[in-house]
Design a protein with these regions (language model features):
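Hydrophobic alpha-helical transmembrane segments
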Residues: 1-113, 118-121, 126-204
Length: 204
């Protein structure tokens, strides 16, 4: 938690400094949100990966996969890379986009920056690591807590948008409710189950 204090203080300082200047407040919030929310880069990586896979260039697809997730791509074939891409995009839609916007709406810049810092710490040391084991566990638990509501909101939004990709809203939501707890992550299942049902593919 102490590692996130500077982010909270910085966000609070900007918030206080711009409180009497609505124009500057709106500008700093917009710029920070644009920098924090990873939706544009996420969609770009997804489109690039789709084009690479469609071209049949497996080496290029393996080279691009680390841009989306931490899996070792060398032993993966094209269907496995495609599945890893969709799974990563599903979870990152929640972590990078929905959660950041939600926390900004709830607590302004301080809350959004703390969430982003927590998410970054989890990505860096949240997995088992002998050197940072205890710190990593705290980072992972905090990230799970901060993404609890955004993940469920992401699942609901994916169900709502399912017809845009040929899916069915009620079927997608029913699948989310039935399958989300089969995922090892307390949050990842909500996102992945929704995307799997909407796209009619198998994930996880």
């Amino acid at each position: 938690v102490g590692a996130l204090t500077p982010l909270a203080v910085a966000g609070l300082a900007v918030d206080v400094a711009t409180r009497r200047h609505p124009g500057w407040r709106a500008l700093t919030t917009a710029v920070t949100t644009w920098a924090v929310v990873g939706a544009q880069s996420l969609s770009h990586e997804g489109r690039v990966m789709a084009d690479v896979l469609a071209s049949g260039d497996l080496d290029a697809a393996r080279h691009r996969l680390p841009h989306l997730c931490g899996r070792d791509p060398e032993a993966l074939d094209a269907p496995q890379i495609a599945r890893g891409t969709v799974e990563s995009m599903a979870e990152n839609t929640s972590d990078a986009a929905v959660a950041s916007i939600l926390w900004c709406a709830v607590g302004g810049l301080p809350a959004m920056l703390v969430h982003r810092g927590s998410n970054t710490l989890d990505a860096m040391i949240g997995h088992h690591n002998d050197r940072y084991e205890n710190f990593g566990k705290v980072a992972a638990k905090l990230d799970d807590a901060l993404n609890w509501l955004p993940a469920r909101l992401t699942g609901a939004l994916a169900a709502l948008c399912a017809p845009e990709v040929g899916g069915n809203r009620s079927h997608t939501w029913a699948t989310v409710r039935a399958e989300h707890d089969h995922h090892p992550s307390p949050n990842g299942g909500w996102c992945e189950a929704a995307w799997a049902a909407a796209l009619a593919v198998q994930l996880g």
